[in-house]
A protein has these predicted regions:
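Hydrophobic h-region of N-terminal signal peptides that target proteins for export
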Residues: 9-18
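A metal-dependent hydrolase metal-coordination microenvironment
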Residues: 28-165, 169, 178, 198-199, ...
């Protein structure tokens, strides 16, 4: 009996010690609130630029999404991102009879939350048409309302009038085929596009890589998320598609300038895609080569980033996990290549 009583008393004491007592009736456990934990994405800067991460294709209940706009900001903060764009459909709003507000309302709600959490929020929208036009995001817009037009050409003209940054979305959707249509090619020739998604949702569009390189636009990787982000990608750092940006400053203007200058990398599912010069600088900042005993051909590589790398040394493949060091032996010179870093469809 004494042992049982002692156990009960110790348990009660532990409970009180672990809790913040509001009064004799209510104990609070704020430390169990997972909302206040941010999964930091530690990525190195490169010379002259600050490295930021973002998602530039996101939906809310104001179009066909499942969550309120401020929830998108909460998700981005928890996932370690720095910037998001709210890009609800202009033409497709199935919740329109239940949700009040004009086409700028989702941005206003998200931007207010962004100020509280330190997340940059970009005003945007998605021009939603069937092929051959396709889906197109207009970012950094002034007003979404006049973007809703009868003809897609009118919407593109309005985007130009508002000095928007324009992105071609999921170019292989919905028919699993990507080839520029005549109208898309004309818009590229007129310099109306600034970026192309090479990753969207759970898909990659490898043929887009060469077009991005040819046209000199930005590589983008975005979630196009509609449901809660954890429902699609799980919980943890580096799981969702994200665009890596090399910015002159940590501001909306800095993000815009980086996209317009095509200083971006696309990342998803352990794979990086981007311009060779940027990818080289970034990889060199992530990985450090150490000779352990060159006479015996023993070396090590340390990965100080939150991203994984796959190193091919001859015929051997080494996984370099985030924040880890690997050792390997190379007694004679061998060709070396990062298996998960691409500068084109078939170029590593």
């Amino acid at each position: 009996m004494k042992k049982i009583l002692l156990t009960i008393l110790l348990s009660a004491a532990a409970m009180v010690a672990a809790a913040q007592i509001r009064n004799e009736h209510v104990y609070k456990f704020p430390e169990r609130d997972a909302f206040y934990t941010r999964n930091e994405l530690r990525l190195p800067d490169i010379a002259g630029y600050e490295t930021l991460t973002g998602d530039f294709h996101i939906h809310t209940v104001f179009s066909d999404g499942k969550v309120w706009p401020d929830v998108r900001v909460n998700e981005a903060w928890r996932d370690g991102l720095d910037v998001i764009a709210v890009t609800d459909h202009l033409e497709y709003r199935p919740h329109g009879k239940k949700i009040e507000g004009d086409l700028n309302e989702p941005y206003r709600i998200a931007a207010k939350r962004g100020e509280q959490l330190g997340i940059l929020v970009i005003p945007g929208c998605e021009i939603t048409r069937q092929k051959p036009v396709g889906h197109i995001n207009a970012l950094f817009i002034e007003d979404a309302n006049p973007m809703l037009c009868d003809e897609p050409q009118q919407a593109m003209d309005e985007a130009r009038r508002q000095n928007a940054v324009v992105m071609l979305n999921h170019p292989g959707w919905p028919d699993d085929h990507f080839k520029l249509s005549d109208i898309q090619r004309r818009w590229f020739d007129e310099k109306r596009f600034h970026a192309i998604e090479i990753y969207n949702w759970l898909e990659a569009y490898p043929n887009a890589a060469d077009l991005i390189s040819e046209r000199g636009v930005a590589y983008m990787s975005n979630s196009d998320i509609h449901q809660p982000i954890a429902d699609r990608y799980g919980v943890g750092r580096g799981l969702r598609p994200m665009t890596i940006l090399f910015c002159r400053e940590h501001t909306l203007a800095g993000v815009r300038e980086a996209i317009e200058a095509s200083r971006t990398l696309a990342y998803f599912n352990g794979i990086l895609v981007g311009r060779a010069d940027l990818l080289t600088q970034f990889v060199k900042a992530c990985l450090t080569w150490h000779p352990v005993c060159p006479a015996e051909g023993r070396y090590e590589i340390t990965n100080t980033s939150e991203l994984p790398f796959e190193l091919l040394v001859g015929e051997a493949c080494y996984d370099i996990a985030p924040n880890s060091t690997i050792r390997f032996t190379m007694k004679t010179p061998q060709p070396m290549m990062l298996k998960n870093c691409f500068t084109g469809r078939d170029r590593r």
